[in-house]
Amino acid sequence: MKKTLLLLFVCLFVGISHAQAQVTVKGTVISSENNEPVIGASVLVKGTTNGTITDINGQFTLTNISPTNKTIIVSFIGMETQEVTIKPEMKIVMTSTTEVMEEVLVVAYGTAKKSAFTGSAKMIHTEQITKRPVTNVIESLSGQVAGLQMTMTNGQPGETPSILIRGISSMSAKTDPLIVLDGMPYEGGWNNINPADVESISVLKDAASTALYGARGANGVIIITTKSAKAGDAKITVDAKWSANTRGEIEYDYIKDPGEYYQAHYKALYNYYLNAQGQTPDQAYVSANTNMIGTNSQTGGLSYNVYSYPEGEYLIGKNGLLNPNAKLGRIVNGYYLTPDNWVDATYHTALRQEYNVNISGGSDKAQIYASFGYLDEDGIAQGSDYNRITGRLKTTYQAKPWMRFGANISYTHSIQNAAAGGFAQAFNTAPIYPLYLRDTNGKIMQDKNGDMYDFGVSNQGPLNRPINPNSNGIKLSQLDTYNTSANTLNGDAFIDINFLKDFKFTFNAGTSIRDSRYKNALNPFYGTANSLNGSINVQHWRRTTLNLQQILNYNHSFGLHNVSLMAGHESFNNVYEELYAAKNSMFSFFQNQELNGAISGTNDESSYKSKYNTEGYLFRGMYDYDGKYFFQLSYRRDASSRFHPDNRWGNFYSVGTAWILTKEKWLDDIKWLDLLKLKFSVGQQGNDRIDDFLYVDTYNINNSNNELSLGFSRKGNKNITWETNTNINLGIEFELLKGRLSGSIEYFNRRTTDMLNRFSVPLSLGYSGYYDNIGDMNNKGVEIDLKYIPVKTRNVTWNIGFKCNTL
């Protein structure tokens, strides 16, 4: 009986103990980005099959949890998996994987984590590049990079803008940045790169970023990385864009009314005759009115009077205002004169259409990316347009676990037609001059070439125009040809070989051929070429480049120490060829705009060829401790064919360091501060972006009575050498409030020494001057780059950016 009671007591105790040990846990899972619930997140007791998912409110309940289970695992696609200690009531904040994934920058000869980078760089991604309909890929950087200045000179479609990074660094040498396309220096031109093919653009600004590119990187470097395929099923992307362009600039406040223009011109002449010539007010009144509409430009004559008024009266009254009896419109020499709006006639709404198709995919070993693009852009000025066809094929293959190779080839064909300069004439022509020729009934006259335009010459119209005579930019844009056609073939290949665990050898080879042909045909009917019976000039140029790189990388980590070393050699060869010829007296202007369509030679034929070579040895060492302290050293020894052999080699370096303060324990309590990083760099680079052969005397070959003769052209100076840029960069990077507010503030100081300038000498020496390293220049300023995200939900993200710089 006692045994039975004891057994019952034990069973009851065990049952009660088990019932008391079961735990129920409730909780909520939210996103760190927007504090919204994460719906459908998996919540699993670690080491068991006991799990559930969150409901529409992000809430979950787990029951029957054993006291031996201390941890739950929370996971969701696109978010960082978390292991959390079990509590009765839980609030779990999940972080997006894209948020914790550290940004990787494309830098000189490779990539670098943004946190480990000690230099100054800005990276733009494909989303920012393709969201705007830009013809030139570099236009996507407009307003995106602090310290980058972009200038468009004429607004022609297909125009290549000029770029400055942190100001002008030289007065004589070129100041444009180096373009690097997929790791290789690129000479093909911005327009030959289809923006739809671009994955990212990195702008490198300081010496720590650009020193490895040596002399060619002295003015900054812009690295363009094209898209690559990823393993997986084939993916086809089709993109079509249509847009319209109109004139965007606001007009200056200038006189547009013909009456107001005559009044202003009269007042100037009246004051001249009254004050400078000593005439009486009545005399000055008559002189100003008479000479204003006269044909002598030396006395202020405008030649054209487009108002009719009673005989015996003057156009401008003694009160300085237009005669109230004057009416717009006047017949002169069989033509009806009335002014036109030249500006409105010059511009029109231009249509733009762009189509892109790309196919990508592959296996774990081989991937392929292929693309085709077509662009047709009309210019806002009559006679201007741009047409482009692009194609790209990019492949990679993992042949062995230790060997990978690939190739990248692209082709671009473009045709650009430029306007005949109607912009300047439209804004420089007074509002009293007609654009068209009209008969006595006021109707625009016609000839075999369509509407007849007033060129301001009496043999083809009513009168001689003192301003821009024998010219009408709008009609010339319809007839004259300013055509550039180009073909660019660019290709590169690489092979990576990994050996001895931490070593990788890379061989890169890149070549490009850019072939361009420019044709300028001036019509024989009107304008300056009328007396020549038309003219034609043709220019052809070709640029061929070859770039070879051999790079050895070593990467090793031991404990909290990380070391990365790189050594390499690079050679670059550039051959430029140019051919030019011109003729007059064209036989059939519309049917044959070639040199064989003209019969009169101009003795203006020439050809030219130049070669430019560089060679460099490079080294970079990078070290960091615990992802907290960073140090970088770069060195390059460069040689350039643009200097005398005695001064051909130069040594350039950079040193950079960075410190991430938020990884220090004494900042752990500041929860709103996500990142605080200090960085500093200093370095020197050379600049050889000068003309060829400045170190030798040059001569012109002349025809002297059919005899060969030489004429002195330019005095050389064998002592010229590299312009040297010394760069200092000090910056701070920060992120606050879970990445809602981020940015950087940087101070830079760039000093150019041994700047190349022309040095004038007395003409008695037989020449006017020569080039020498005699100048200095200093650029310094502050760059601010801020980003704020006020709204970030699942469907809407609102970014506010602010960028500015001083110089």
What name fits each language-model region?
Residues 226, 357-361, 391-397, 491-497, ...:
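Residues on the lipid-exposed face of transmembrane beta-strands in outer-membrane beta-barrel proteins
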Residues 502:
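Active-site and adjacent substrate-binding regions of carbohydrate-active enzymes
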